[in-house]
Amino acid sequence: MQLGLSVSDSDASPFTPLAVLELAHDTKAEAIAWLLNRIRDKQRNGGAELLVDQLLFPAQDGQKPNPNVFVVGSTLQRLLSGAEDVGLFKEFQDGTMRGFTYANRESFKDFEGDGEGFLGDAECQYIVKHELDTLRAKNEEYIPGYPKYKLYPGKSIVRRLQSKGVLVQYFPLHNKEDLKRLSFSWYKKIKLSFQPLDDIRSYFGEGLGLYFGFLEYFTFALIPMALIGIPYYLFDWEDYDKYVLFAVFNLVWSTVFLEVWKRCSATLAYSWGTLGRKKAFEEPRAGFHGPLGLNPVTGREEPIYPSSKRHLRIYLVSVPFVLLCLYLSFYVMMVYFDMEFWAISIYHENPNFATSVLLFVPSIIYAVVIEIMNLLYRYAAEFLTDWENHRLESSFQNHLVPKVLVFNFVNCFASLFYIAFVMQDMVLLRQSLATLLITSQILNQVMEAFLPYWLQRRRNKRVYKRMRRLMGDKELPLLEQIQLETEMNTYLGTFDDYLEQFLLFGYVSLFSCVHPLAAVLVVLNNITEVYSDAFKMCHVFKRPFSEPAANIGVWQLAFETMSIIAVVTNCALIALSPQVKAYFPESDAQLILTVVAIEHVLLAFKFILAFVIPDVPKHIQVKLSKLDFESLEALKKRKILEVAET
């Protein structure tokens, strides 16, 4: 994909664009010149040493286009040296994964000639992003042309430009040929086989590769439960006593499922070079603010915000707000039960087809309300977490995730707990679970895939018509592509995707013993989810930058917490079984003590199983230990040589 357009630097040779930078329409000329100079400048002078050219779009319907759109690329040698700077791991000749060094490039597998094709597309774009993000202010006091926009020595220029609205967006470009091949092998043909995870990782990066790996693993892991659930559904529909065995299987399955996933995740992460990779030093978030102070770790000046003030905001504002939202969720739940009782009373007064259909209406309305409340709360939680002013993105996520998980858990499952343990109505529990699950699946598919696709398709048609009308029959595939991708929606990460799978895991593990078909419904949902998520990543959203990941992060803990709650829930459901109650006809206290004892035994078994099954396969542990040993030996030899020289 060679650049053959009007450019701002006539001396620049054509190069392959890897990313797009869009500055604000009214950005000062001196700020643009300063930024481009820093991007092009040599590394020894504090620059990124990248290639950058300006795109000149034609006027659109009498409106002047944004002239401040630039494409960024790099020479091959700069990418290879950048791979060493970011600590990229590649496969060595002996089959182990090692940190890439330019000096030893010939010792790495698949490195041939000058190294063309050695780095994947996503890796090249990640290197470019890293070099842009680590462009640091030197002795400038402010952004040229903006005296009020202060610069701090040693701090990221790009993050400062983003926080002040000068840099509108920057994103990696799609590679049409690679995308076409990936689309064909991924979702354009119906097949009963595994996803091309290595190709997904090579194109989108490790973070998305692990998400789709988890989605695939979760779907296949549900198949045994689905196969067992079908005969239970067909032959023992009203016999809840038979579901005791299904509940026990559920408990064992949820533990084994998560422990085996850790091993699968470690295998994928090692083969992709992220398992033993050290995390880069985390820069402050773009929105972080506070009075200027000295960072005790780096010794640089940067905004400082007292943790005491942040804690006051959390405990005096955020926590009460979350509790208020939980109260509103309970209130809406009680309104739903009033509607449910009203529908049941009408059915009992006049049982016919119309009133039998009416029985499902309250649950459907409640499911829609749940999705709306989850969406509104998500925006509020993000606003509050941003207002708490966390310095690092990891801290921001660690405070956002619990807020969202707690509310979504209560909002989605509180009614089911109430029906199961207060009303003790298993028929209504089965009906409500099925209705909530099916309705939420349909709404998620519409909101996540079909609606964005329809909006993007309309937007694409407008762009195609406008570009063809302006440029006639001229060949402009790259210009047209960049125009399209600039107007695409930004992919906000895997948060919502993991959240959806977390809730589905809850439906399966918490109450599936009273509705064994839940696993079947989730399997069908996830099969369509694979195709819809693949399509939206390829054609609906901007291509995201690669995000190195060694596991699914905080979501592993979230799923494990859900599995522990599932043990308690299923033990309680077993205790409500008439068959179990028959063993304790005279003493409810004895029944409760027995169930609690069994629950503790199952939890102990769960933790023992988690301890017995290693998180990392033995052969990978050996390779990692071997690498650590060789690194220590190399360090010893270097110290001996230094001593000998002195």
Curated annotation (Swiss-Prot):
One of its GO terms (biological process) is chloride transmembrane transport. Its main location: membrane. It comes from the Eukaryota. It is a multi-pass membrane protein. Keywords: Membrane, Transmembrane, Transmembrane helix. The chain crosses the membrane at residues 210-230, 241-261, 314-334, 357-377, 404-424, 502-522, 557-577, 592-612. PANTHER family: ANOCTAMIN, ANOCTAMIN-10. Does not exhibit calcium-activated chloride channel (CaCC) activity. Can inhibit the activity of ANO1. Belongs to the anoctamin family. This is Anoctamin-10. The gene is ano10.
